[in-house]
């Protein structure tokens, strides 16, 4: 059994070394492992949605290695789906409400684990724990719904973890 520590907060409340580790972890997952074309400098991944009001959920193992991360953005401010990918809403209005938040940059890859397949990040105990912690944190912020631009694996994870997911557009 691996111990998982969960941290939540903003860039102003999380320790600076944790934020740097978070950006480095996101670079390893999204740029190096998944091959996404993202803004990245010196092995650190961040974009225009990593602002002072952005909320993060970060998991670490018992050796303080980051094993997961999630980003939460209010839909009443600019966010990834609304600004970059509105076409994925399949003609639906772009959400803009206090109780709807965006979940983005969700990853749960343990680079020390025996398997680090990209698909494993959606089914591991860490992924489920991170998702539950993120949903609890979001609910505490007033979120009743989360929206996400995500691979089909996230939809499967939500379903397996007992959450309802609704696809806005084709996969």
Predicted regions: what they are:
Residues 2-48, 56-60, 66:
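Short amphipathic alpha-helix that is part of the acyltransferase structural core
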Residues 22-23, 30, 56, 70-72, ...:
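Long, contiguous hydrophobic alpha-helical segments, chiefly transmembrane helices and signal peptides
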Residues 22, 55-69, 139-146, 167-171:
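Short, Lys/Arg-enriched charge-dense amphipathic segments
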Residues 78-80, 86-171:
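Acyl-donor binding region in acyl/amide transferases
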Residues 9, 20, 26, 62, ...:
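Homeobox/homeodomain signature
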Residues 42-91, 101-108:
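Conserved donor-binding loop and adjoining core beta-sheet/short helix segment
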């Amino acid at each position: 059994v691996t111990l998982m520590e969960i941290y939540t907060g903003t860039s102003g409340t999380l320790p600076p070394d944790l934020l740097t580790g978070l950006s480095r972890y996101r670079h390893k997952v999204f740029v190096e492992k998944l091959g996404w074309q993202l803004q990245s400098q010196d092995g650190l991944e961040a974009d225009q949605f990593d602002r002072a009001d952005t909320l993060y959920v970060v998991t670490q193992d018992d050796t303080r290695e980051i094993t997961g991360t999630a980003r939460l953005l209010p839909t009443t401010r600019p966010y990834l789906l609304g600004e970059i990918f509105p076409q994925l809403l399949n003609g639906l209005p772009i959400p803009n409400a206090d109780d709807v938040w965006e979940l983005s940059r969700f990853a749960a890859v343990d680079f020390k684990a025996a398997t680090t397949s990209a698909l494993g990040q959606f089914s591991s105990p860490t992924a489920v724990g991170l998702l539950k912690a993120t949903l609890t944190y979001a609910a505490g912020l007033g979120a009743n719904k989360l929206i996400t631009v995500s691979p089909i694996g996230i939809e499967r994870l939500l379903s397996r973890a007992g959450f309802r997911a609704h696809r806005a557009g084709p996969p």
